[in-house]
């Protein structure tokens, strides 16, 4: 079968004999393509031509085994620098057309541009040495003549020379780091291109703010605890101070309370800044920023009918009346009144439970004291008092 016009199929054995001077990764897409065109991560490679001493060739390698790769003599392409990370590559006629190259790292882009310029100058001088050209201190635009030579198609390189794919763990980490740097540096276009590559390969990411974005810690969080079992008595509340970091999540705070005070996360309901907290959000997102910021912890009661197997040993259920037994007197928790055996029980004050955070509210409150949820329309104070 005849090779493509203006070129020839390269033998796989020739690849191993070429001395690779530098290989870099860049997001490549046709220059004339629309803004919705997908950029493909490709490897640019500059190597010495073993058949032409003192000459070099530029290779554009695809990802994955069996991919068709392109290479051109360096003197046959036109290479232009448009910005710190934006370059253009114009192959000779018969090639894929002008390509836009976006590098993930400005230093890597500068090093590549300097090497291409040095190799171009050395090739034009007709040097007989295959030694790498000297790297200059800075990159300058490179624009080379374009003689009518077509690109050469060649088979896939050896397995050891394949470019890293985003399916590789190392490549994923590098791309994730590049995405973080692009966002931190305000490079919207670079961040979009790296994100597109990650999305094409469906890489699972967890995007979180760094601790430097949050207020400094630790700080003392003033926590008021309420026990649902005895919400009408003075012994139903206690006040404690917890050392926390604003960047910690509510879930981490729940585990801290379980470790220090013994209440499992399943019975904890946190209200901070008039909001019922969700485990995934940070404390700072609810306004926790400095010493003395308040928080409210509402402790649910365990079900009346416990299972036959008993509570889990890892997360034991909080039983009614446990708040007074778990807190030492140093926390300022007043002892509950001990009614005489002959005294009649006092009538319960009518109250209503918030449907959002389950806080027990006074009967005359139109909304929840903790989270401002409106009182249920179906609540009847007379019926509540009679029960």
From Swiss-Prot:
GO biological process, one term: regulation of CD40 signaling pathway
S-S bonds: none
Protein name: Sharpin
Organ and tissue specificity: Highly expressed in skeletal muscle and placenta and at lower levels in brain, heart, colon without mucosa, thymus, spleen, kidney, liver, small intestine, lung and peripheral blood leukocytes. Up-regulated in various tumor tissues such as kidney, liver, ovary and pancreas tumors.
UniProt-annotated location(s): Cytoplasm, Cytosol; Synapse
Pathway assignment: Protein modification; protein ubiquitination
Ubiquitin-like domain ranges (all copies): 219-288
């Amino acid at each position: 079968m005849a090779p493509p016009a203006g070129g020839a199929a390269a033998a796989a054995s020739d690849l191993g004999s070429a001395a690779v001077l530098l290989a870099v990764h860049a997001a490549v897409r046709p220059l004339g393509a629309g803004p919705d065109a997908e950029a493909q991560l490709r490897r640019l490679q500059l190597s010495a031509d073993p058949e032409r001493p003192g000459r070099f060739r530029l290779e554009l390698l695809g990802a994955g085994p069996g991919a068709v790769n392109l290479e051109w003599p360096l003197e046959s392409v036109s290479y232009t620098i448009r910005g710190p990370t934006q370059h253009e590559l114009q192959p000779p006629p018969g090639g894929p057309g002008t390509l836009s190259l976006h590098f993930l790292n400005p230093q890597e882009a500068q090093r590549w541009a300097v090497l291409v310029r040095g190799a171009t100058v050395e090739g034009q001088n007709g040097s007989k040495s295959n030694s790498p050209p000297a790297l200059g201190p800075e990159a300058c635009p490179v624009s080379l003549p374009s003689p009518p030579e077509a690109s050469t198609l060649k088979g896939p390189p050896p397995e050891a020379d394949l470019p890293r794919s985003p399916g590789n763990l190392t490549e994923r980490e590098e791309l994730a780091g590049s995405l973080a740097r692009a966002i931190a540096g305000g490079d919207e276009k670079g961040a979009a291109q790296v994100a597109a590559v990650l999305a094409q390969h469906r890489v699972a990411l967890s995007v979180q703010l760094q601790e430097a974005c949050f207020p400094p810690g630790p700080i003392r969080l003033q926590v008021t605890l309420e026990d649902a079992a005895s919400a009408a008595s003075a012994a139903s509340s206690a006040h404690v101070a917890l050392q926390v970091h604003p960047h910690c999540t509510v879930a981490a705070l729940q585990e801290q309370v379980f470790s220090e005070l013994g209440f499992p996360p399943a019975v904890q309901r946190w209200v901070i800044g008039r909001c019922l907290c969700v485990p995934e959000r940070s404390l700072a997102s609810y306004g926790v920023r400095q010493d003395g910021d308040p928080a409210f912890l509402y402790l649910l009661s365990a079900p009346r009918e416990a299972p036959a197997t008993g509570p889990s040993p890892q997360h034991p259920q909080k039983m009614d009346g446990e708040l007074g037994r778990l807190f030492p007197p140093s926390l300022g928790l007043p002892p509950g009144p001990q009614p005489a055996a002959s005294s009649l029980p006092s009538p319960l004050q009518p109250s209503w439970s918030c449907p959002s955070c389950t806080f027990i509210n006074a009967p005359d409150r139109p909304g929840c004291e903790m989270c401002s949820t409106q009182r249920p329309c179906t609540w009847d104070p007379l019926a509540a008092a009679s029960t």
